Amino acid sequence: MGCCTSKVNADPVSTVLVIGPESAGKTTLLRCVGRRCAGADESEPVRTMPTIGQEVEYLSAPGARVMLQEIGGCLAPTWPRYYDRAAAVLFVVDAAAPETWAEALVLLEELVGAVRDKPIGVVLNKLDAAAADGAAARGLLGLEELAVDVFEGSLTGRGALVDDLRAFALAARPLSIK
């Protein structure tokens, strides 16, 4: 299978935008996907700081290269500037922080309204936290009514989610340059 890489090669690059409210776990997910793809030790905890700006992780597989581009939650007003260049979007929500769901709902509705022709994935993150309520988050965010893929994640970013996100990202096709 493919791995993460920072080498330049001839395969076209797809961009998957990774966004969501502050402290939802976007950077942890990016780093865990990167570790898994690189075959690195996943037992060490992922250390992160709030993203001011962006974080980038590259994935590759035969015939495909993907740039996972996280734009920090504090930059939500700028997210629409990135939609045209993205082949797909991942929206990360902290399922253990119900106080953030109203903001997440507004941001998700704006995203779905603006991005109609590209795959959107929603990650309900931190479901292994004591305060997590995935069913309530799904209901409030209206995920059953939206045309989105839903993924479930943990505090550590470990588990099947990493492989699911990698598959979602690698399925994104590069946009043709106009």
Residue ranges with predicted function:
Residues 2-175:
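TRAFAC-class small GTPase G-domain
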